[in-house]
Amino acid sequence: MMITFMAWCTGEDLKPRPFSGFTILAEHIRPDARGHVRITGPRPKDPPAIRFNFLETEADRQAALAGLKHARRISQTDPFAECVASELTPGPEAETDDELLEHCRANGLSLLHGVGTCRMGTDPTDCVVDPRLRVHGLKGLRVVDASIMPRIVSGNTNAAAIMIGEKGADMILEDARA
């Protein structure tokens, strides 16, 4: 779990509100659920079918609850507590786990750093690229970015994406010399 503090108040749309406040985001950075992206047609302009599978596993639901409850506890400690007039979202009326999960389902979102849409692995029925980043079943095409990560790293993906780019460049050069 990563806790992010913002020195402004946001609503469910994450847009700043025209009054003073702060926002605490509880970000589950290693979810268990796996989504997918599928091609829907032969044309490049055909929109993809995207299934996020947010909160599909019990572990993810428990992590969301723990993060939200932890953010609430933080807001009740000094010096935060003296700044809080009221909780805007999910709001003090959301008390039970079911109510809190409903808030998470309705308002949870993916923040940046999507990975795994072209997952790397040896099984072409389950993975897009092989361990040398070549697209299974196609000659001359590689994917060299964060989309090849089989699972997301525990934090910002920038360093891992740079490493993938460096390693991918090395592989391309090695294969060109062979």
Give each language-model segment a name.
Residues 1-160, 168-178:
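FAD-dependent oxidoreductase catalytic-site/capping-region signature
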